[in-house]
Amino acid sequence: MLDATPKEIVERKALRINPAKTCQPVGAMYAALGIHNCLPHSHGSQGCCSYHRTVLSRHFKEPAMASTSSFTEGASVFGGGSNIKTAVKNIFSLYNPDIIAVHTTCLSETLGDDLPTYISQMEDAGSIPEGKLVIHTNTPSYVGSHVTGFANMVQGIVNYLSENTGAKNGKINVIPGFVGPADMREIKRLFEAMDIPYIMFPDTSGVLDGPTTGEYKMYPEGGTKIEDLKDTGNSDLTLSLGSYASDLGAKTLEKKCKVPFKTLRTPIGVSATDEFIMALSEATGKEVPASIEEERGQLIDLMIDAQQYLQGKKVALLGDPDEIIALSKFIIELGAIPKYVVTGTPGMKFQKEIDAMLAEAGIEGSKVKVEGDFFDVHQWIKNEGVDLLISNTYGKFIAREENIPFVRFGFPIMDRYGHYYNPKVGYKGAIRLVEEITNVILDKIERECTEEDFEVVR
């Protein structure tokens, strides 16, 4: 399929081939689904909304509910004010959400639609029923990525909902970043294991990983409740897990409600999870329970067991910046080498963090690229191969062409099932990652070894 990819590398400035990202509204829609009884609303054409819902549904194998302003030629010329006002009336009448979270698209951004004014006009006209809410964020698709869109929606949540009443609630806010519902469940489990009260926002657990009960619910049981979102302004601290996806919301909350924040890496791997657990302990004075220490010990034990197959292995990684920063560190902890590290999301701090990480580990000769794509990585691999590729589903074409062991990681994963129930964060998530990484390497060894080396025990 990719046999025509040339080995000779030509510098590209204005072209992306097989990008390692998707557009802002996907992330904004995902964040909005993490609000209880919320209907995400795409202010643009029907095609945009359909695509964004499809990407999420293909990844989670669950329906991603959302509405649209349904732009046609008229709205494309005169603006979408009339469309969204009609849409909001219809949505509350037909679907009765507690809150509508509006995000923009390329078209409405190019037109310059003034959403705060539209929302204010709807409030004045009584189009928003008493006790209901409409919030918004701006997510132009031609800037940033789905991670940027997630961050912008979190900022919108804070701008519209967070309140400081002056009465502290004794809780810690946690903004989990662009991670899956299983990861959010795992983060909450660690809070609960340490008996620490918290507010996670947004929270898609129970929304995009819910059970089949035989009864359809347009708004599942999960998601952060509106009263909790308002209460985030009374918390003692906000933990921002991943600077790209979470810092914007944490900084906005600090500025608006004077809630201090601390930025941590996404807790993937040993050191990043250690930092997360210790941050909880230091912020609350709570001791780390023996159950969590046991999980850490199990992870270390597995890393030692697998070390002979991972030491010195060269790895190519592509994905979202917060996850890839943490995963690159974990790859180093496993004794392997992050040879090629790429994100499609803009922001040079990614390059700085990875470069510093590699320098600290004494690793030379690696390539790191911001706003890179799968074509970059494929060409690099053609010139100097790797032992393992870690990326979303789209990496499978490179893995097939170059016969490289492949671990699916990140977003989207559209060709496998069950991954959305398995966390990658925390010590439990890291155990799962070591298992996947080691086993795909062993699969290749056993697929290609001689009959004499085809061992029963490894």
Swiss-Prot record:
- Catalytic function, reaction form: N2 + 8 reduced [2Fe-2S]-[ferredoxin] + 16 ATP + 16 H2O = H2 + 8 oxidized [2Fe-2S]-[ferredoxin] + 2 NH4(+) + 16 ADP + 16 phosphate + 6 H(+)
Q: Name one GO biological process term.
A: nitrogen fixation
EC number of this enzyme? 1.18.6.1
Gene3D superfamilies, from UniProt?
Answer: Nitrogenase molybdenum iron protein domain, Nitrogenase Molybdenum-iron Protein, subunit B, domain 4
Q: What positions does the entry give for [8Fe-7S] cluster binding?
A: 23, 48, 106, 141
Subunit (UniProt): Tetramer of two alpha and two beta chains. Forms complex with the iron protein (nitrogenase component 2).
Protein family: Belongs to the NifD/NifK/NifE/NifN family.
* Protein function: This molybdenum-iron protein is part of the nitrogenase complex that catalyzes the key enzymatic reactions in nitrogen fixation.
Write down what this protein is called: Nitrogenase molybdenum-iron protein beta chain
Which species does this protein come from?
Clostridium pasteurianum
- Source organism phylogeny: Bacteria, Bacillati, Bacillota, Clostridia, Eubacteriales
